């Protein structure tokens, strides 16, 4: 027996059906697509159409809206801030603000400002300037001997001052 003698068992691999190759092929003329019309053509799918049944996107009610005045804060928790201080990317002696957090890479971008949240604990005595802070975060920073200054909301660059 040689490697070239090895073959599949008869009927174990079925040949694929080539459609639209004459009536003798068994899948000629319309090629399994039924009669004429839109769905007999290539690439046709009517998006959202469910065969006449009321489509899902029309059965469900409209909900909510997009507030154009929404302000998105970059959120930072106390444990993340403490990790950055331990790693040396933030100087505990200088004021911690949005600019220093972005510069150190702790926050990616602070377009709407930074909001301080209270998960974890802080050991360093810090002076923090942020645009928002939770009560628990303020309490934890003050317990460690630091201060939190809440800044006024950031104005849009496009807005007249």
Curated annotation (Swiss-Prot):
Entry GO MF terms: rRNA binding; structural constituent of ribosome
PROSITE patterns tied to this protein: RIBOSOMAL_L15
Pfam families in UniProt: Ribosomal_L27A (PF00828)
UniProt entry keywords in alphabetical sequence: Ribonucleoprotein, Ribosomal protein, RNA-binding, rRNA-binding
Bias (Gly residues) ranges: 21-37
Gene Ontology cellular-component annotations: cytosolic large ribosomal subunit
SUPFAM superfamilies on file: Ribosomal proteins L15p and L18e (SSF52080)
Keyword Ribosomal protein (UniProt): yes
Biological process annotations from GO: translation
Region entry Disordered, spans: 1-43
Record's subunit section: Part of the 50S ribosomal subunit.
Function: Binds to the 23S rRNA.
Family under the similarity heading: Belongs to the universal ribosomal protein uL15 family.
Annotated protein name in UniProt: Large ribosomal subunit protein uL15
């Amino acid at each position: 027996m040689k490697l070239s003698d090895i073959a599949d068992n008869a009927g174990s691999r079925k040949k694929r059906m080539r459609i639209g190759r004459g009536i003798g092929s068994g899948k000629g003329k319309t090629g399994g697509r039924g009669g004429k019309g839109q769905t007999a053509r290539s690439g046709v799918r009517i998006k959202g159409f469910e065969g006449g049944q009321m489509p899902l996107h029309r059965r469900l009610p409209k909900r909510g809206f997009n507030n154009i005045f929404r302000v998105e804060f970059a959120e930072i928790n106390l444990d993340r801030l403490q990790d950055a201080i331990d790693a040396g990317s933030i100087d505990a002696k200088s004021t911690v603000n949005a600019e220093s957090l972005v510069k150190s890479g702790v926050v990616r971008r602070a377009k709407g400002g930074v909001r301080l949240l209270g998960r974890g604990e802080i050991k360093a005595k810090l002076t923090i300037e942020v645009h928002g802070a939770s009560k628990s975060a303020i309490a934890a920073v003050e317990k460690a001997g630091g201060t939190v200054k809440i800044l006024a909301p950031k104005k849009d660059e496009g807005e007249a001052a």
